[in-house]
Curated annotation (Swiss-Prot):
The keyword Chloroplast applies. One of its GO terms (molecular function) is translation initiation factor activity. It comes from Porphyra purpurea (Red seaweed). One of its GO terms (cellular component) is cytosol. This is Translation initiation factor IF-2, chloroplastic. GTP binds at residues 270-277, 316-320, 370-373.
């Protein structure tokens, strides 16, 4: 747009001739703003000033203001902008809404529609009035929708926050008392006593015990922590009473009308190699004693024997000291027990242990003195020795039958069986076959063809194919029932010992097995039992990373890295438990023993890889090698140790731990001497000595004592007599001693010579 020269001249002339004339200014056509001129003092100047200010809104540099006189379509958008701008000032999300509104503003660059400034201003005023009268419905609705959509999540957030606050402000209060059964980790202890882990760790740190939340502490430390926070700890006797009240090993008989007599369960106990298996071989007409590795029983073995048309179930238990848990379990499962004592060996520690188990369980028992074919004269002596264990024979006026037997000749074997049936009749053993089956797992293993399998002693009820069962953390739908003759049967009556298939995992030995109504119920109960760790898991946890009050005071910083890590594969759960029991007896103040994994099953390539990765020793016990495991071991240079006898395994682990011990020496005195004079030779101090006892040897260890305090300990480097080097000096002779690292000899120093003899390292 160009400036009109004619108009410009007319305007300038009017300014120059008459400043008060405003009419000529009105005659101007299409005035254009060039720059602002402020004139003072006259009314005409004021009018001109107002016109020029008005022209500010009409020039090409103010297109946004000119848009107010645009067509009605544009005015609608502007009216919404003005109204929405007022509404959004009071909204929390006004910035977001303002941005949306501004994005919808359209600027029209066509200036040809503006021809007259007067008409433009009038039209603009009218348009503004109309726009202000109309409510901005579309914009307000969109705003309401935005606000409405945010209300529900906000309410949910508030509800979640309030629930979190309640959970934080309402913690579980610490219990008044707790019962201790097994060692716990710091995290588990925190959950048990409802005390934060940090508080427990802080308390132990102040006691000089540094732990983490995953480390296991023994019952003494747990008791100390509980008492510090005002929580009582139940004694072992109280725990035993609670166990007896909830003992599921005892069959529950509901309806006496359905009860029938059941066969007695007889457990044979005694010291190792006293003839337990030989007795069962004679009764069962088998030869298992000669088939056993090492000549010892390492598992609980069950037999069903028929005598005089009556059934008797025998359980043969291991006699080795490592199988204490098995013997204890056998004593608790049995109706009648037989204690075997060899006539040529007498009463042994495992014999006394078996008697104590039976007396605690209040189980009637018979004493059978075996091997009388070798030594019959010792029978009376054994009877009198048993009195010290509160076992009084019928011959001496007591109630315990004592029967001399021979498994070689069969002498008095029938008398022993008759006595068993007589005791069973007196005990009135009964069960209800109409109930759901209930029993105890005697043994469990992983079968390579059938999966997890278990040997079950049925105490009450009848077990059927297809029954749903829960065994601790394991659930099962019984696929097969195998009797003692290795035959598949459809059902098993009370006092039967059968093998069952169809388990979800290998259960722990000693677990209670219960038949339930549905598969869903079995799975739910198995999940509930997961909160209480299985017997094996508890024993493994108590063995690994143990921290006790005794070890805290004896362990050194340099011993913390001395650790033997084991991966063990066994033949069954009974062996697993026995191995853990034996390993837990090892002292761990000098070397820590860590069982990384222990399970029944074959040694696999995965086990080999795990052993290689963790630098662990891979040990097998009476188990086989899976395909590919030997090749993996050769490739990864992993040595696999496979044992057949449990005490060989235990000694092998002990040797591994002892090899990590620092060498220990004992001092053996050799001789004594006394310093008579000190002289220098080539800037070296020489001690002139007289040997007062035995002799001195070159390169032997010596102690230099001054006023009964050791001032030096080391080796003799040079030993001279007059000017000659000698290897030894006998008592009564004089000699010169030189030690390069000790030059502070004084007259009157005592010298004690000794040898360091390596001691046998022990844990």
């Amino acid at each position: 747009m160009f400036l009109n020269n004619q108009n410009f001249e007319k305007k300038t002339s009017s300014y120059s001739t008459n400043n008060n004339s405003s009419e000529k200014i009105v005659d101007l056509k299409n005035p254009q703003f060039i720059y602002k001129i402020r004139l003072e003092s006259t009314s005409t100047d004021n009018l001109l000033h107002l016109d020029i200010d008005k022209s500010e809104t009409d020039g090409p540099n103010t297109e946004q203001h000119l848009e107010l006189s645009s067509p009605p379509r544009i005015d609608k958008k502007n009216k919404n902008f003005n109204k929405a701008h007022d509404l959004l000032d009071n909204k929390k999300n006004k910035n977001r809404q303002r941005k949306k509104i501004k994005n919808k503003i359209h600027i029209d660059d066509d200036d040809d529609n503006f021809s007259d400034s007067t008409s433009n201003s009038a039209q603009t005023a009218g348009d503004l009035a109309i726009s202000l009268m109309r409510p901005p419905k579309p914009r307000s609705q969109s705003i309401k929708k935005v606000i409405g959509n945010n209300k529900i999540p906000q309410q949910k957030k508030q509800q979640v926050a309030s629930s979190i606050d309640q959970s934080i402000t309402l913690p579980n209060s610490p219990p008044e008392s707790i019962s201790l059964i097994n060692p716990l980790t710091i995290q588990e202890l925190s959950r048990l006593i409802c005390i934060p882990e940090t508080d427990i760790i802080k308390y132990l740190f102040l006691k000089g015990i540094s732990v983490t939340i995953n480390q296991t502490v023994d019952n003494t430390i747990i008791s100390s922590v509980a008492k510090n926070f005002g929580i009582a700890v139940d004694s072992q006797e109280q725990n035993n009473k609670k166990k007896k009240l909830t003992n599921l090993d005892i069959p529950v008989i509901v309806d006496n009308h359905h009860c029938v007599n059941r066969p007695p369960v007889v457990t044979i106990l005694g010291h190792v190699d006293h003839g337990k298996t030989s007795l069962l071989d004679y009764i069962h007409k088998s030869n298992n004693a000669n088939k056993e590795v090492g000549g010892i029983t390492q598992n609980i073995v069950a037999y069903e024997v028929e005598f005089k048309h009556q059934q008797i179930v025998f359980l043969d238990t291991p006699g080795h000291e490592a199988f204490t848990s098995m013997r204890s379990r056998g004593a608790n499962l049995t109706d009648i027990a037989i204690i075997i004592i060899a006539a040529d060996d007498g009463i042994k520690p495992q014999t006394i242990e078996a008697i104590q188990h039976l007396q605690k369980a209040n189980v009637p028992f018979i004493v059978a003195i075996s091997k009388i074919d070798k030594n019959l004269d010792s029978v009376d002596k054994i009877q009198h020795d048993l009195v010290a264990q509160n076992v009084i024979s019928e011959k001496l006026g007591g109630s315990v039958p004592i029967i001399p037997i021979s498994s070689v000749t069969g002498e008095n074997i029938d008398k022993l069986l008759e006595t068993i049936l007589l005791l069973a009749e007196l005990e009135n053993l009964q069960a209800d076959p109409t109930q759901l089956a209930q029993g105890v797992i005697i043994e469990a293993h992983l079968d390579k063809f059938h999966g997890p399998a278990a040997t079950l002693l049925i105490q009450n009820g009848t077990l059927h194919i297809g029954d749903n069962m829960v065994i601790g953390m394991t659930h099962a739908k019984i696929r097969a029932i195998i009797n003692n003759a290795k035959q598949k049967i459809n059902l098993a009556a009370p006092s039967s010992v059968v093998e069952i298939w169809g388990l979800s995992s290998v259960p722990a030995t000693g677990e209670v097995a219960l038949v339930v109504n549905s598969d869903k119920e079995a799975k739910l109960k198995a999940i509930e039992n997961e909160s209480t760790n299985s017997i094996i898991v508890q024993k493994q946890k108590s063995l690994n990373s143990r921290i006790t009050l005794d070890t805290i005071s004896t362990i050194n910083a340099k011993d913390e890295n001395k650790q033997v890590t084991l991966i063990i594969k066994t033949d069954n759960q009974g062996s697993t438990e026995a191995i853990l029991d034996s390993l837990s007896q090892f002292p761990q103040s000098k070397v820590q023993l860590n069982v990384l994994s222990i399970f029944p099953g074959e040694i696999t390539a995965t086990d080999v890889e795990l052993a290689s990765t963790t630098n662990s020793s891979l040990i097998g016990f009476n188990t086989n090698f899976a395909p590919g495991s030997r090749q993996a071991a050769a490739k990864l240079n992993v040595i696999i140790e496979n044992y057949q006898i449990i005490y060989a395994l235990i000694e092998g682990v002990r040797e591994k731990m002892e090899t990590l011990l620092d060498p220990e020496y004992s001092e053996v005195p050799v001789g004594e001497a006394e310093v008579g004079t000190v002289f220098s030779l080539a800037n070296r101090k020489i001690a002139g000595c007289r040997v007062t006892n035995n002799k001195l040897l070159k390169n032997s260890w010596i102690k230099v004592l001054r006023e009964n305090e050791i001032v030096y300990q080391g080796k003799i480097e040079s030993l001279k007599r007059i000017r000659e080097d000698v290897e030894e000096i006998q008592a009564g002779n004089e000699c010169g001693i030189f030690i390069s690292e000790f030059q502070l000899w004084q007259t009157g120093d005592k010298i004690q010579s000794f040898d360091l003899v390596p001691k046998k390292r022990s844990l």
